[in-house]
Curated annotation (Swiss-Prot):
Pfam families: Ribosomal_S16. Gene3D superfamilies: 3.30.1320.10. GO terms for biological process: translation. GO terms for cellular component: cytoplasm; small ribosomal subunit. InterPro entries: Ribosomal_bS16 (IPR000307), Ribosomal_bS16_dom_sf (IPR023803). The keyword Ribosomal protein applies. Keywords: Ribonucleoprotein, Ribosomal protein. This is Small ribosomal subunit protein bS16. It comes from the Bacteria. PANTHER family: 30S RIBOSOMAL PROTEIN S16, SMALL RIBOSOMAL SUBUNIT PROTEIN BS16M. One of its GO terms (molecular function) is structural constituent of ribosome.
Length: 91
């Protein structure tokens, strides 16, 4: 089963709010999820607001989940991918 870390859209028209979730790659964007690992609010007043459970994100990356391009950018800005690479090369 191919697993992806991706965004599911919530919120109203022109006011998006996203959950960062782990889901089967074949399921629809807002369909069945395996686990929610964070949130992303691009419409925040000052800057985009991101909250991610770092332990869950690292667990799913270690288990082989592939982040989408947007989630990859979010994870790299949060420093989670750097931590993942350090853990991977430390072994």
């Amino acid at each position: 089963m191919a697993v992806k870390i991706r965004l599911t859209r919530l919120g109203s028209k022109r006011n998006p709010f996203y959950r960062i979730v782990v889901a089967d790659a074949r399921s629809p964007r807002d369909g069945r999820i395996i686990e929610q690992i964070g949130t992303y609010n691009p419409a925040s007043v000052n800057a985009p607001e991101v909250k991610i459970d770092e332990e869950l994100a690292l667990k799913w990356l270690k288990d082989g989940a592939k982040p989408t391009d947007t989630v990859h950018n979010i994870l790299s800005k949060q420093g989670i991918l750097k931590t993942f690479d350090e853990q991977k090369h430390a072994k």
